[in-house]
Regions:
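Axial heme c-ligation environment in periplasmic c-type cytochrome domains
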Residues: 41-48, 67-97, 101-104
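Sequence context surrounding c-type heme c attachment/ligation sites in exported
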Residues: 15-26, 59, 63, 88
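Electrostatic cytochrome c docking/interface patches
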Residues: 1-20, 110
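The canonical Cys-X-X-Cys-His
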Residues: 17, 21-31, 81, 97-101
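Conserved functional loop/turn residues at catalytic and ligand-binding sites
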Residues: 24, 32, 54, 72
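Inter-heme linker and motif-flanking segments adjacent to c-type heme-binding CXXCH motifs
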Residues: 34-36, 74, 103-110
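Flexible gly/pro/ser-rich segments immediately N-terminal to CXXCH heme-c attachment motifs
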Residues: 8-15, 54, 83-89
Length: 110
């Protein structure tokens, strides 16, 4: 089983998505997706570890988009994960954010 490839986005959208991740997501998910952001310890259940290989394998890009736009409750996960409905009308930025999340998976050692 392979991790779904990150969406292709232009460099400016990727940069904007990285800044958006740092502002909206990193406080809980951590700067590298390790669920170690400054607010992570206060959140129950703990934020998803986005760098987790099994999560990356099982989460499709479409599901990730859905969680981002509609919140965790939309996929039967924690309602603590807030929705970002503004991103539904910004597909390049949304795809950029998915690409940022995909970048957290590090290659397995050979």
């Amino acid at each position: 089983m392979k991790v779904e490839a990150a969406p292709q986005v232009d460099p400016s959208s990727l940069l904007a998505a990285q800044k958006l991740y740092e502002a909206r997501c990193a406080p809980c998910h951590g700067i590298s997706g390790n669920s170690d952001g400054e607010k992570a310890a206060q959140v129950r259940p703990r934020p998803q570890r986005l760098s987790d290989r099994m999560w990356q394998l099982n989460a499709s890009n479409e599901r990730i988009r859905k969680v981002i736009v509609y919140g965790g409750g939309a996929v039967h996960k924690s309602n603590v994960m807030p929705a970002s409905p503004d991103l539904a009308q910004q597909p390049q930025l949304l795809d950029g954010l998915v690409a940022v999340l995909r970048s957290f998976l590090k290659p397995q050692p050979t």
